[in-house]
Amino acid sequence: MHIHKELELTPGQSAPTVGVLALQGGVAEHLAMLESLGAQAVRVRSVADLLGDDGTPAVDALVLPGGESSTMDRLCRTFGLFEPLQRVIHAGLPTLGTCAGLIMLSTRIADPAPGQQSLGVLDVTVDRNAFGSQVDSAEVSLPWSGAAGHAGTDDDAAAAPSGVVRAAFIRAPSVTEVGDGVEVLARYRDTVVAVRQANALGTSFHPELMGETAVHEELLNMVRARG
């Protein structure tokens, strides 16, 4: 079991508010993870949940959860969230996408569903169903190159500056092409499964299902760095 670190707040500093897109997919686990780390976690179901009256973000960060990426895309457009999400993330709002959320953040989808769109935030190409079979689904320890990580003695973590993360792959996507401005944070069997570019972080896997805090800590570190 990894020991997580709650946010260290200076006197007078309030806990960050992190919105979790809650139209479809695995929302509750992300909410619980964020709350355990000291953040205020809220569900984002509408533009009013995302933006304040002045049109600026009502949250300090976002999580796009796992689920079915084409369904999430369709619902975002149905509820008028697609363009506002795209705008605030491109403007610098720290954002984490896991599994389907990674697909939504990508610029290119190798095998999109009919009519499927993505937010075009991460300069990567994703294969939606790279870990599509039950055989390919797995729970593993991965070397992790993020600032937040857990020290370990696992052989597979030897090359990881920050240690290892526990990851669950469930019919997960993979990253098949990475642009010049994208940092690779983790690989599984030589396949890229976690990336970061500017304010956006994406993972093929589900850290929240493993009780793994490092990825969400990374997101909160991005909020802290933004001021």
What are these regions (language model features)?
Residues 21, 27-28, 68-69, 103, ...:
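Gly/Ser/Thr-rich beta-alpha loop segments that engage phosphate groups in nucleotides
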Residues 63-65, 96, 202-204:
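Structural motif
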Residues 41-42, 95, 200:
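Hydrophobic anchor at the start of a short beta-strand
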Residues 1-78, 83-91, 213-217, 221-227:
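N-terminal beta1-alpha1 cap of cysteine-dependent amidohydrolase-like domains
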Residues 23, 98-100, 122, 171, ...:
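A secondary-structure boundary/capping signal
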Residues 68-149:
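Cysteine-nucleophile active-site neighborhood
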Residues 1-11, 128-136, 141-227:
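Amide-donor transfer/coupling interface in amidating biosynthetic enzymes
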Residues 15, 58-59, 91-93, 116-117, ...:
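Short coil/turn connectors at secondary-structure junctions
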